[in-house]
Amino acid sequence: MTRPVVTRFAPSPTGFLHIGGGRTALFNWLYARKHGGTMLLRIEDTDRQRSTQEAIDAILDGLKWLGIDWDGATVYQFARAARHREVAEQLLAAGKAYRCYATAEELTAMRDKARAEGRAKLYDGSWRDRDPSEAPAGVKPTIRLKAPLTGETVIEDQVQGRVAWQNENLDDLVLLRGDGTPTYMLAVVVDDHDMGVTHVIRGDDHLINAARQKQIYDAMEWELPVMAHIPLIHGPDGSKLSKRHGALGVDAYRAMGYLPAALRNYLVRLGWSHGDQEIFTTQEMIDAFDLPAIGRSAARFDFAKLESLNGHYIRQSDDHSLVTLLEDLLKYIPQGPAIAAKFDDSIRAKLTQAMPGLKERAKTLIELLDNAGFIFADRPLALDPKAQAVLTPETRQLIGRLRAALEDVSPWTAATTEAAMRAFAEQAGLKLGAVAQPLRVALTGRTTSPGIFDVLAVLGRDECLSRLADQSA
């Protein structure tokens, strides 16, 4: 009988949820959901100096924002140290591990000698079969695995294919340090086994770890999980992903105005493909996702593609939900509190009314908020340089006449204000554009905006007449 699928995401809380970590979590989540299994979350907090509660909170918050949920309680690796030590002692008792009394100076000399001779194996195994009675006084021993000396260690990886390491090149890895703390290699294996993990999906920078960890599985006679080591994310130029490329925390993408659904869609296509399909609903991702469809070569991060995809998701979004997303965004941007103070039911209603025109022009929520700025701007409007250039003395006189032409319009709608403006332009012998642009500048402070008659309708009669008065001669 096939075991139910159990995946896990196991970040180290030494910083934010990196974009690569977000993709790893997504792949684990998709695979578990596709197979009706579970995805577990383990915080690998054994590095006590670098692990912080702030980082843990950022990871949990980032996963929730991405829409990635996990099953069961979060497991904290450090809390399981006693169990890790227990397994090391089991291996010791079974003769599959040994105490190593090599001093720090001796280990340094061994490494230097091995490197000078071009050998991959840095530890010479001098305590492997040595009598502990020969131990020097005052040295706290480590516990090392008795790794096989000949043959090879093989992983049949779902992404990388068959990967083999010659055992003669692999050290007897340390399981317990001299102070009794378990190493990462041991802790990961024990936790994955005890948590019932069936599939380990992680970055291919962990591939060398897989060889070490398989040796522990073999020594304990435990079943090895299915392994899938996914390619790392590189910058557009093929170099290692850096901050200028997009090596940011998931929280930074939220603050830049990306939608969770758009980022999920973009991340799933980084290294995985399903024919030529680019846009996926979450359910389509779950249905289509499979490990063999992940490529081996590094995926390249492309901000332009992410922006384009995000723009698609914005245009497809419901107007009311976009207003909610805009309001939520304010918590994460520097100017947010000042704008949030202006949000009331009237502003929300105006934003919803303007949204059909606003969302066609925006690729991010930041752009959307910026384009909507005229709705909650304070009077008198701050004009951008292009708008200032439009407002000549003659234009200001024209704005005064426009205001007079609009004063008696009733009811105040996009259609009625358009009719009034067209009549004014015809009477004045002007093209509609010559009338619309000064009107746009006076009402929005910019030379670009949604349709000018939509702007008139959204702002309402009193606000429009007041803004026109501010800019008229």
UniProtKB/Swiss-Prot annotation:
The keyword Ribonucleoprotein does not apply. ATP binds at residue 243. Keywords: Aminoacyl-tRNA synthetase, ATP-binding, Cytoplasm, Ligase, Nucleotide-binding, Protein biosynthesis. It is found in: Cytoplasm. The keyword Cytoplasm applies. GO terms for cellular component: cytosol. Belongs to the class-I aminoacyl-tRNA synthetase family. Glutamate--tRNA ligase type 1 subfamily. Catalyzes the attachment of glutamate to tRNA(Glu) in a two-step reaction: glutamate is first activated by ATP to form Glu-AMP and then transferred to the acceptor end of tRNA(Glu). This is Glutamate--tRNA ligase. It comes from Rhodopseudomonas palustris (strain TIE-1). The gene is gltX.
